[in-house]
Amino acid sequence: KDIFAVGNAAYAMYEKAPENIQVVFPMHHGVIARFHEMQYLLRALLKREGRYPNGAEYVIAAPTDVTEVEKKAFYDLVHHSAARAKTVRIVDRAIADAVGIGLDVFSAKGIFVVNFGGETTELSVLSGGKTVLSRLLPVGGAALDEAIVGSVRHNKEFLIGRITAEQLRWQCGILKNTNRRKLTVAGRDLAMGVPGARQISDGLVRAAMKDSLSEIVRAIQSMIERTPPDVRSEILKSGIY
């Protein structure tokens, strides 16, 4: 099969590509689902850098709550690529997240990290450079987008795509924004069967996301309750990242 585009260029074709072009997602729920396509994506990213850093050390951040087979797939991806890696290490994504935002994971007695991704949300409690508790929820941006699509269809009799739903989520779904606003989007009028436009309110978008976000909040509360008391006291001081 020929590959025409990767990354954002490929995503822009999602739901718009002709029948002879298939848009696929190499990752599914935080792990590699299509190894061949993931190899091509890695190769494209390395080419974008203009060189293959031969002999480099690679560190891959993988979800904590996945199987050893799924973790090995990440290792094999780099080890058998053109990167010619000197070493390949798999680390807990929560540790990498904390280091990435400048936290001292080794001296901290209690850190709570929430990684909200495309298809999953990972909750992790860290202490002394180790993962104390971790949970991978099958809820992410994609679930919110699908909920928005369904809500617009039900309430407006109007069909929008996931990319449009994602734009609504970013522009109207900010929970701290108290200003009421509406956004005009393109789609298909289901009653007439023709293309059209509709104004979608931020209230409709937020209501669509409520169930999924509530699930994440409940999971956070449950994990805090299961956290050892000394670690929990530190988290209550520092907050959630």
Give the role of each language-model region.
Residues 1-116, 126-241:
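Nucleotide/phosphate-binding catalytic cleft detector across ATP-hydrolyzing
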Residues 118-120:
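Short acidic, Gly/Ser-rich segments with clustered Asp/Glu that frequently serve as metal-coordination loops
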